[in-house]
Amino acid sequence: MSDILNKILDVKADEVAAAKKYRSLASLRDEVEGNKEARAAIRGFEASLRAKIAAGQAGIIAEIKKASPSKGVIRPDFHPADIAVSYEKNGAACLSVLTDVQFFQGAPEYLKQARTACALPALRKDFMIDPYQLYEARSWGADCILLIVAALDHGLMAELEACAHELGMNVLVEVHNAEELTAALKLKTSLLGVNNRNLRTFETSLQTTLDLLPRISPDKLVITESAIVTPDDVKKMRDADVHAFLVGEAFMRAPDPGVELGRLFN
């Protein structure tokens, strides 16, 4: 595990502990489980991706991200609702919205604003380590949550996956290498993200996805993450029968993120 990931997880544990003192899990659970309208309004994250792919298009998870630990502020002019509308207009299947405050300058409000502004399902992009965060995610409107294998042991991963599914959310499990893939394949979810960014060096290479593909069964929906910068990168993945993408920085640095999505994928 990288030093930065360790640091993030330590902070995340403190954040969850503080949140529980402010509001108990029992109280949050009662709110989420008692809100039948919100449960009925969950948008199918996996279904949206598969519908795009079935129509011969790329299934694009378009990310809304203001900053990152390695790059600092990526988009100073940051309006989540406007970005979400532009993504939807230009063919995105889903949203990914950063809610981590300290390291990515995200916020729960950004998730709420983005999802309310459009009809796309939304992923809470954060470092999930406790069931409490899943109830938070659902209360904010998330349709999917992220589990990062590098950050979790298998028992906790399985517990978080089961909790998310009970709440009606999809689960995207993220891996960086073959060892993590072996652990991820023990989960039930079909959504398998391959992050092309090395957690130690922060360098990116699409070869990471290509190397892991032969180990993944066809029933899994492979989502390649990071390192998608040019139309040639997209073609390289689609030629390898990878049709789902999570892209953030390439869109966020453009004047209009949705227009850049259209340029990159059409």
From Swiss-Prot:
GO process terms (BP): L-tryptophan biosynthetic process
Claim: Lyase is one of the keywords in the record: yes
Pathway: Amino-acid biosynthesis; L-tryptophan biosynthesis; L-tryptophan from chorismate: step 4/5
Keyword Amino-acid biosynthesis: yes
InterPro entries given in the database record: Aldolase_TIM (IPR013785), Indole-3-glycerol_P_synth (IPR045186), Indole-3-glycerol_P_synth_dom (IPR013798), Indole-3-GlycerolPSynthase_CS (IPR001468), RibuloseP-bd_barrel (IPR011060)
Catalyzed reactions per annotation: 1-(2-carboxyphenylamino)-1-deoxy-D-ribulose 5-phosphate + H(+) = (1S,2R)-1-C-(indol-3-yl)glycerol 3-phosphate + CO2 + H2O
GO molecular function: indole-3-glycerol-phosphate synthase activity; phosphoribosylanthranilate isomerase activity
Entries under CDD domains matching the protein: IGPS
E.C. code: 4.1.1.48
Entry keyword set: Amino-acid biosynthesis, Aromatic amino acid biosynthesis, Decarboxylase, Lyase, Tryptophan biosynthesis
UniProt-listed NCBIfam families: PRK00278.1-2, PRK00278.1-6, PRK00278.2-4
PANTHER family: INDOLE-3-GLYCEROL-PHOSPHATE SYNTHASE, TRYPTOPHAN BIOSYNTHESIS PROTEIN
Record-stated family: Belongs to the TrpC family.
Protein's recorded name: Indole-3-glycerol phosphate synthase
Species this chain originates from: Janthinobacterium sp. (strain Marseille)
